[in-house]
Amino acid sequence: MHAFAVDGLPEIDAGDDLAALVAERADLTDGDVVCVASTVVSKAEGRTAALAEFTPGPRAEEIAARLADVTGEQKDPRFAQAVIEEATEVIMDAPFLLTETTCGHVGVNAGIDRSNTGGAELLLLPKRPAESAARIQAGLAADVGVVVTDTSGRPFRHGQRGVALGWAGLPAARDWRGETDRDGHELAVTVEAVVDELAATANLVSGEGDDGTPVVVVREFEFGDHDGSEQLFRAVDGDFVRQALRGWTFDGA
């Protein structure tokens, strides 16, 4: 397996055909997985916004005041309102906003970006990244998989890594349960988050900052003769970390 960046992509504007732009610059073959950064998907889909578009309600005012108390920095309640509107749940409101987005992804600030925004104040995540991935896949001639990626922090460890927000043309996970390890023992719990691993691979190749490349092709990845699964995001009743966070309050300030 190897991965390479798709070079020469222009700055993406609303209405741009990402599939066509990729196809013009990459000689894709059947079985490739095309990993596309959510930032360019959002730009192509016109998911930019100005803070003035968000009128803060009482909850946003409360969150902004609380964050200002905790961090010692002034917080814009309009940004808090944008996060509330883009989230399905605010899991934590201090010392930062941890949210669930409409696609099921849990991250900070509903994934709203204030860098690489193409001149806008805010760049919102794609509304339905799985549908975004399917549209890109449909526009490519080769039989490929597509993963819409983002960078995200993680609990218990420093640093960010690439994760999948939406995907098409391949299962989300590879299920090893029922197979055996090298000692002949049956595997009982191993379900491998394939699309996240592909997203992390792409993130290593694409890089960050002004040298970043938003599209990476992973070639000769083989899913193998395994069961697949579309389950990537935990249901709340089995997500014990989220349940614990719901009952937790930050008491640092």
Swiss-Prot record:
How it assembles, according to the record, is: Homodimer.
For whether the record's keyword set contains GTP-binding, the answer is: yes
One GO BP annotation of this record: F420-0 metabolic process
Q: Which InterPro entries match?
A: F420-0_g-glutamyl_ligase, F420-0_gamma-glut_ligase-dom, F420_ligase_CofE_arc
The gene name reads cofE
One family from Pfam that matches here is F420_ligase
Q: Which residues form a coiled coil?
A: none
Q: What class of enzyme is it?
A: ligase
Per its Swiss-Prot or TrEMBL entry, what cofactor is needed? Mg(2+); Mn(2+); K(+)
| Protein task | Catalyzes the GTP-dependent successive addition of two or more gamma-linked L-glutamates to the L-lactyl phosphodiester of 7,8-didemethyl-8-hydroxy-5-deazariboflavin (F420-0) to form coenzyme F420-0-glutamyl-glutamate (F420-2) or polyglutamated F420 derivatives.
Say which domain of life the source belongs to. Answer: Archaea
Q: How is the cofactor bound?
A: Binds 2 divalent metal cations per subunit. The ions could be magnesium and/or manganese.
Q: Indicate yes or no for the key word Cytoplasm.
A: no
Task: Report which reactions are catalysed by this protein.
Answer: oxidized coenzyme F420-0 + GTP + L-glutamate = oxidized coenzyme F420-1 + GDP + phosphate + H(+); oxidized coenzyme F420-1 + GTP + L-glutamate = oxidized coenzyme F420-2 + GDP + phosphate + H(+)
By sequence similarity, the record places it as follows: Belongs to the CofE family.
> Its pathway?
Cofactor biosynthesis; coenzyme F420 biosynthesis
Q: What is its EC number?
A: 6.3.2.31, 6.3.2.34
Q: For a divalent metal cation 1, which residues are the binding ones?
A: 113, 150
* One Gene Ontology molecular-function label: coenzyme F420-1:gamma-L-glutamate ligase activity
Give me the residues that bind GTP, please. Answer: 9-12, 38-39, 43, 116, 206-213
Q: What is this protein called?
A: Coenzyme F420:L-glutamate ligase
Q: Which HAMAP family match?
A: F420_ligase_CofE
| Keywords annotated in UniProt | GTP-binding, Ligase, Magnesium, Manganese, Metal-binding, Nucleotide-binding, Potassium
Please name the source species: Halobacterium salinarum (strain ATCC 700922 / JCM 11081 / NRC-1) (Halobacterium halobium)
Residues annotated for a divalent metal cation 2 binding in this entry: 151, 208
